[in-house]
Amino acid sequence: MNSTAHIHHEALLRARVALLGSGTLPVRQEVAAYRLLVQVSPLAYLPRLAEALYEYSRQEFAHQPGTALALRAEAVAAARRMCALEAGRTPLLHSALVRYRKQLELLARREELDAVDAEIALLGHGGH
């Protein structure tokens, strides 16, 4: 195993231990752990990453709407990826889009709101 692979393995191990070892892990650390773990187990960790990103945006960045928006956009991307990997995950994507939409509305981003509304409507009619 080369040093890069060893470091990556060590980081993954630390992330797993952090998530398993603490019931009160700060959401920032939770997000960091899920971002790592999703690389090796996307089916297991994409839904958790999407939820943790939303919580992180809400808890830590309510006063920074631009950062909160970026985190919610990342949550939508994780949910989209999950939907692509496994059928029946549209509720995850729907939830992420609704949360993203709320942040767009807060920032009065009308053009992006229209696109998100269209995607939500597609999901509501059996799309994706």
Q: Which role does the model predict for each range below?
A:
Residues 20-35, 64-79, 109-118:
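Helix-turn-helix repeat elements of alpha-solenoid scaffolds
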